[in-house]
Amino acid sequence: MRKIRTGIYGLNSILDGGFNENSTTVVIGSSGAGKTTCATQFIRRGLLEGQEGIFVSLDENKEQIIREAVEMGWSDILDYLEDGLLVFIDASGREFSNFIRKELPAFVSDWRGANTRIAVDPLTPVLWSTKDQYEQRDLIGFMLKETRRVGTVLCTLEEHGPGELTGPETIIPMYLADCVIHLRYKAAEGNVTRFLKIIKARSSRHSELSHPYRIMKGLGLLVDSAAYKREKTTRIPSQIKDVLDQKSTLPKSIQESVQKALEGLSDEDFKTLKAEHLIENIIAEYSEG
């Protein structure tokens, strides 16, 4: 699966190289966690490579989003807007059902690009527009499907409560998204600590750790990925090889199946695996009867 760079420093290395192309990602966090900054970074990364960008705001107006980007040190956003490479859709204050079912599909149908980055910031007002969960799911699902037709999508979602992803506002977007990223921060005695965690990422190997991150002017979100090191294994560890040698009487087809099954593992995986138990399970899967 083709990967695209996220634009978030340090995130690609813990997300198997980046977002899957034409996928949907939901970034969840409370106010001040850096969600809009994250969305802007994602869009700007594509703009720097000549990709078109669409920023759909469902809450703040265009001027506010641009002002925040310029204050972050990204004044080139103004040039991209003037050149038409970046398109801004201000849907704040609109009737969301009509916007999602009529206006958005019409816009997408007229859009000629096929490798676009789309940011939707935030999804929360859509959920607030109706208390019917079936209607919420239908609206969010339709919106993600339409935007994904022309590119890769990143949405933000406001989180309320203790930050455990248990609120009703998070359930539907988390279910529908291909990738979910959680931003958390704590303020105590004047100090702020922030953590990023990848909750799920379909068809991707990713870190399951909580990674510290910072928000820095000129850079945006900077994720500390040092704790996560994943490299594809270039050799079978000695304990695995010893067990395989003991199984040399197995049919060649099964031996080949076992070897192939091990190819996708990383050096990190072998740290917590018991060699004999692993091999026995793989052999059992490919043995007849």
Q: What is the predicted function of each stretch?
A:
Residues M1-M72:
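The Walker A/P-loop phosphate-binding site
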Residues M1-R2, R112-R117, Y185-Q255:
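Conserved P-loop NTPase
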Residues S23, E49-E52, D83-G84, V150-G151, ...:
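Short glycine-/polar-rich loops that comprise or flank the Walker A/P-loop
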Residues T25, N98-L176, V180:
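P-loop NTPase motor core
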Residues Q51-S129, N281:
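Conserved inter-motif catalytic segment of the P-loop NTP-binding fold
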Residues D59-E63, S92-S97, L123-V126, E159-E164, ...:
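Conserved nucleotide-binding/hydrolysis micro-motifs of P-loop NTPases
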Residues E71-W74, T170-Y175, I199-K200:
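Short, hinge-like loop/turn segments at secondary-structure boundaries
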Residues V258-G289:
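Terminal-proximal interaction/regulatory segments of ATP-powered molecular machines
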